[in-house]
Regions:
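Active-site nucleotide/adenylate-binding loops and adjacent lid/helix of ATP-dependent enzymes
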Residues: 2-7, 25, 53, 98-180, ...
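A short, local hydrophobic-aromatic micro-motif
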Residues: 89, 117-118, 204-207, 221, ...
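Short loop/edge segments at beta-strand edges and connector loops
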Residues: 42-44, 121-123, 183, 262
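ATP-binding N-terminal substructure of ATP-dependent carboxylate-amine bond-forming enzymes
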Residues: 1-88, 94, 99, 125-130
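ATP-dependent carboxylate activation and anion-phosphoryl transfer catalytic cores
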Residues: 110, 238-273
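Phosphate-binding site of ATP-dependent enzymes
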Residues: 161-247, 268-270
Length: 273
């Protein structure tokens, strides 16, 4: 089997998937150790993708969702390789939209009976005082469509209207989109990896994610922490809470229509909800 890994320069992307060169090289080494022919491609243009199509690999592993094109439309890789008759890893573009749009994902999951934190979206000036806000403080503010902690830091946690307005304006100016405001959940945080295989079925692995404590006494899994890779990962045990965390992640995986693999982040309140 001939396998090719596809990634791109990450500077122009709001989200990177697992597309960093370090991660891609780790995947490349693992595939080669299994005895398969493998190649890593850092693609920048449609021409780069065309060269891959000409080689007709048996499988392409998509480490990013799209290639950003300056002064043009982004090239969504799942669509591109599907249209060219080449098998690809991961989910379709329709499913990947849930990964890019947090509100779309939340509303879809809620319609299917899966709990998410209460939320609303806002732009500067939409609400003029605390009493108008749909949810009471404390709130957590984040970009609508960015991943990898982009735009998230200690100031994302807001407890009063002045701080809310300040962070809202900053995010809106940076991303030019409405801002997502969520109820703040003050419990533990987990990430659940899911792999769905034909040979061995569903594999589910969860770890607890513990960000370092900041100078303000907060533990926020934001952009700085993720870039520095300074969070601690703790093995999740087998208990009633972890069984519920894993079940929630698996339910979300299937209701979102994901295939092959995914990673679901789960935050718990101090009451265990």
């Amino acid at each position: 089997m001939r396998i090719e890994i596809i990634t791109t320069s990450n500077e122009a992307l709001k989200e990177t998937g697992f597309g960093t060169l370090k991660a891609c090289n780790n995947v490349l080494d693992s595939i080669r150790r299994l005895g398969y022919s493998a190649r890593l491609n850092v693609c920048e243009t449609a021409g780069d993708l065309g060269d891959i199509v000409k080689r007709k690999p048996d499988l392409v592993i998509l480490a990013v969702k799209y290639i950003a094109v300056e002064h043009g439309d982004d090239i969504w890789l799942s669509d591109y390789f599907k249209n060219n008759g080449i098998n690809f890893s991961g989910s379709s573009r329709e499913v990947l939209k849930f990964d890019s749009d947090k509100v779309l994902a939340k509303s879809h999951l809620r319609k299917n009976g899966i709990r998410t934190a209460d939320y609303f979206t806002a732009i500067p000036g939409q609400y003029t005082c605390e009493s108008e806000l749909p949810i009471a403080f404390p709130l957590f503010l984040k970009p609508l469509d960015a991943a990898n902690g982009n735009g998230i830091d200690d100031s994302s946690f807001v407890t009063n209207f002045a701080d809310y307005e300040s962070k809202l304006l900053w995010l809106y100016n940076l991303f030019s989109l409405p801002v997502l405001a969520e109820e703040y959940l003050d419990g533990r945080e987990y990430t659940v990896a899911i792999i769905n295989t034909l040979s061995s079925g569903l594999r589910v692995s969860a770890v607890e994610v513990v960000p370092p404590q900041s100078a303000h006494g907060l533990r926020i899994l934001g952009e700085k922490v993720k870039k520095e890779d300074s969070e601690e990962l703790k093995k999740a045990g087998d208990n009633e809470l972890m069984n519920r965390v894993r079940k929630l992640a698996v339910d979300a995986f299937f209701h979102l229509g994901a295939r092959d693999f995914g990673r679901i982040d789960v935050k718990v309140s101090t009451s265990g909800q």
